[in-house]
Each structure stands twice: as structure tokens, then as C-alpha cells.
Regions:
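C-terminal structural segments of small proteins and small subunits
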Residues: 45-78
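Amphipathic, hydrophobic secondary-structure cores in small proteins
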Residues: 1-53
Length: 78
């Protein structure tokens, strides 16, 4: 499955990408898709069997699963 995680800070996005790569998941930093919002404008895109929420940094804004042309929110930190 394909996932997108958004963050409140660029550092949090970088930490999460490194944590996912440490778990053997290919992850990339990218601009946040227009359909989603983010405080810092940077997201992490990754593919995995599950969303690996335990690998997210503390400043994660939300995690979405890609479904067709849209996204399903799996986690939102307000």
C-alpha cells in the first residue's frame, strides 16, 4: 500500500523518513499533495504493508493511505 505522512516541521519529516528507511522501507521526502494540507509543506511518501505508525516522529500531522485518486486519513494529530 502507498502512504503519505505530513508533518508540522521539516525536521520531523526527515526523522520519519530515516526511521522508515531503518525499518527497510523505501521512503522519500516530497512536496505535500494539493489535496492534503501541512504546516511545513514537506511530506514523506512510502510503500509498506501497514502504515508503520510507530515509526512516525512526534510532530507528525497526519498519515494517509492512497486509494485510487484520493486519500484516506489513518491518523490525525490536532
Amino acid at each position: 500500500m502507498n502512504f503519505v505522512a505530513t508533518f508540522y516541521t521539516h525536521l520531523s519529516a526527515l526523522r520519519t523518513a530515516r526511521a522508515l528507511e531503518g525499518a527497510g522501507v523505501q521512503a522519500e521526502l516530497a512536496p505535500v499533495p494539493r489535496a492534503l494540507s501541512s504546516s511545513c509543506g514537506t511530506c514523506v511518501r512510502y510503500s509498506a504493508e501497514d502504515p508503520l505508525l510507530e515509526r512516525m516522529d512526534a510532530d507528525t500531522e497526519a498519515v494517509y493511505r492512497r486509494e485510487g485518486d484520493g486519500y484516506v486519513c489513518l491518523l490525525r494529530n490536532e
